[in-house]
């Protein structure tokens, strides 16, 4: 599942100049984006399922 794949855009070793708060904000933004995509996929599947039943 793509939710558990590692993000290759992030460096493997944290930059010492990057603050802990900045890393937390970045991780929170990524999680929020993943949840948004997941919600959209689920809603599309539910809508598709509703339309397929009526046929």
Swiss-Prot record:
Which InterPro entries does this UniProt record tie to the protein? DVL (IPR012552), DVL_RTFL_regulatory (IPR051525)
Membrane topology classification: Single-pass membrane protein
**Superkingdom of the source?**
Eukaryota
Instruction: Specify the glycosylation sites in chain numbering.
Output: 7
Give the record's keywords alphabetically: Cell membrane, Developmental protein, Glycoprotein, Membrane, Transmembrane, Transmembrane helix
Residues that span the membrane, as ranges = 32-48
Q: Where in the cell is it found?
A: Cell membrane
Where are the annotated segments for Required for DVL/RTFL small polypeptide activity?
19-50
Enumerate the Gene Ontology biological process terms. Answer: cellular response to hypoxia; negative regulation of cell population proliferation; shoot system development
Question: Which residue spans adopt a coiled-coil conformation according to this UniProt entry?
Answer: none
What GO cellular component is one of the record's annotations? Answer: plasma membrane
- Role according to the record: Small polypeptide acting as a regulatory molecule which coordinates cellular responses required for differentiation, growth and development, probably by restricting polar cell proliferation in lateral organs and coordinating socket cell recruitment and differentiation at trichome sites.
Q: In which family does this protein belong, per the annotation?
A: Belongs to the DVL/RTFL small polypeptides family.
Q: Which PANTHER family match?
A: DVL19-RELATED-RELATED
- List the protein's name: Small polypeptide DEVIL 10
């Amino acid at each position: 599942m793509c939710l558990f794949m590692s993000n290759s855009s992030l460096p493997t070793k944290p930059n010492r100049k990057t603050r802990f708060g900045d890393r937390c904000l970045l991780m929170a933004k990524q999680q929020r984006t993943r949840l948004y995509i997941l919600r959209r996929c689920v809603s599309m599947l539910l809508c598709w399922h509703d339309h397929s039943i009526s046929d």
